[in-house]
Amino acid sequence: MAELATIARPYAEALFRVAEGGDIAAWSTLVQELAQVARLPEVLSVASSPKVTRTQVAELLLAAAKSPLAAGAEAKNFVQMLVDNHRIALLPEIAEQFEALKNEREGAADAEIVSAFPLNGADLDSLVSGLERKFKRKLKPTVEVDSSLIGGVRVTVGDEVLDTSVRARLASMQAALTA
């Protein structure tokens, strides 16, 4: 995984520099669409087929993207470069790193919130507001429900984890009692 990140980083950074000259959000959408297409086993199979030219593979990827940027020369050059260098499989990692660069530029971060129970809109807004004060940045939350937490929430922002779940407290108590 670290190898993929290392290989994908220069591509993501180069694409981000291109995106800074235009609409970063639109470029983010395009790279996410391309990553979804590149995850399909059929696309990877076609891309590795000797019967299909590299130009055809690039055209296939761009045709599958709905973003209007896909028709632009910069997008075509980017995809053609990935195809020529046999880097299509890196698109999901490139998209992830592009999103991280975008978040960094916006002073934002993705927050994965796992709750023991479904959160209604007001509870989620209150939680996100408190978390934004704690982490000192704008958060983009994704919420999951995991009843095995018993109660509370576990929040992951980047490499930081805030676990206030009952399960974590019980595990901490168990460790203290058995030590």
From Swiss-Prot:
Keywords: ATP synthesis, Cell inner membrane, Cell membrane, CF(1), Hydrogen ion transport, Ion transport, Membrane, Transport. Disulfide bonds: none annotated. InterPro entries: ATP_synth_OSCP/delta_N_sf, ATPase_OSCP/dsu. One of its GO terms (molecular function) is proton-transporting ATP synthase activity, rotational mechanism. F(1)F(0) ATP synthase produces ATP from ADP in the presence of a proton or sodium gradient. F-type ATPases consist of two structural domains, F(1) containing the extramembraneous catalytic core and F(0) containing the membrane proton channel, linked together by a central stalk and a peripheral stalk. During catalysis, ATP synthesis in the catalytic domain of F(1) is coupled via a rotary mechanism of the central stalk subunits to proton translocation. F-type ATPases have 2 components, F(1) - the catalytic core - and F(0) - the membrane proton channel. F(1) has five subunits: alpha(3), beta(3), gamma(1), delta(1), epsilon(1). F(0) has three main subunits: a(1), b(2) and c(10-14). The alpha and beta chains form an alternating ring which encloses part of the gamma chain. F(1) is attached to F(0) by a central stalk formed by the gamma and epsilon chains, while a peripheral stalk is formed by the delta and b chains. PANTHER family: ATP SYNTHASE DELTA CHAIN. This is ATP synthase subunit delta. The lineage of its organism: Bacteria, Pseudomonadati, Pseudomonadota, Betaproteobacteria, Burkholderiales. The gene is atpH.
